[in-house]
Amino acid sequence: MAKAKFERTKPHVNIGTIGHVDHGKTTLTAAITRVLAERGQAEFKGFDQIDNAPEERERGITIATSHVEYETEKRHYAHVDCPGHADYVKNMITGAAQMDGAILVVSAADGPMPQTREHILLARQVGVPYIVVFLNKADMVDDEELLELVELEIRELLSSYDFPGDDIPIIKGSALKALNGDKDELGSEAIVKLMDAVDAYIPEPERAIDKPFLMPVEDVFSISGRGTVATGRVERGVVKVGEEVEIVGIKTTTKTTVTGVEMFRKLLDEGRAGDNIGALLRGVKREDIERGQVLARPGSITPHTKFKAEAYILTKEEGGRHTPFFNGYRPQFYFRTTDVTGIVDLPAGTEMVMPGDNVAVTVNLITPIAMDEGLRFAIREGGRTVGAGVVSSIIE
């Protein structure tokens, strides 16, 4: 069969299934493809195809992830599902699979369990902005009051992590019934309801090009008679010739004007998200700007040294540390294009962190870096990656 052409007519949204082990995340993923395949909006993927997820390496970390894609009337979705709990943790922290929203799967028979809680916390920490709940295995609970209690418990749990628990859609159903072709209320009807809720409740993400301009500086050189050029890949937004930008991070923030934009040795009027450009900067000396700083729309990003983060520490097998680390650990933090030394504070009651752990830490950098919440970083020792993290909140 010929490969169908990817139609770019519908808006694209990235989602994923999260939740406790054996609550039915993979079964639900398979059920969604089955129900939508009947409408010609997906290719059916069986449980085993999704469960035997290939391992991928993201920033030196091995993660098993399954990717499926499907469409609804309104949208095109890319959906990630992970076989193991550790894979979820790694995925969410590294941003390997950036989620615009998530489907939290909770078994009606068990209610929220430890990993339910941990995945909600992670979603909050790493900036997964929206959650829709699928209350699975609802056919195993005969007591309507019990179902209502579980639903209430889920709403309270979501609210305790600053999600709008009262407003979040909760759809009851049985992923297994739907996967087996049952057309009743808990079977494929529930899947249709779920996808309607995802369509309606999870908004389209803001595209990189619509965000304020930011370009990490990778290299700097001077062109005699013309001035200083900073090169890098535009991360977001657009910069036009003649616009004012700020140089942020490492040193005191300064303003300059972009007097030229070059790409592949051609002069352009503007540089856009995704472009590798050279920006000619007015009145900037070669020594005023360095790798690790960013060019950004004035006022859109500020430099910081102290922040809270969620981090995953690589195992020995992944090429990480062989031993635990303790409070006051001083590795390098690699942000965008450069390493900065930082001191790690562990949470109260945590004596040490073992390879393979994930942990909430407070970090104090020795030099300021341009950052906002959600920024990803690597933790390195002498150029070797030993962990990955994401900024969850900025302190100063």
UniProtKB/Swiss-Prot annotation:
UniProt entry keywords in alphabetical sequence: Cytoplasm, Elongation factor, GTP-binding, Hydrolase, Magnesium, Metal-binding, Nucleotide-binding, Protein biosynthesis
Region of interest called G2, as start-end residue ranges on this chain: 60-64
GO molecular function, one term: translation elongation factor activity
PANTHER family cross-referenced by the UniProt entry: ELONGATION FACTOR TU, MITOCHONDRIAL (PTHR43721:SF22), ELONGATION FACTOR TU-RELATED (PTHR43721)
Subunit comment: Monomer.
Family: Belongs to the TRAFAC class translation factor GTPase superfamily. Classic translation factor GTPase family. EF-Tu/EF-1A subfamily.
Protein's name according to its UniProt entry: Elongation factor Tu
Name of the gene: tuf1
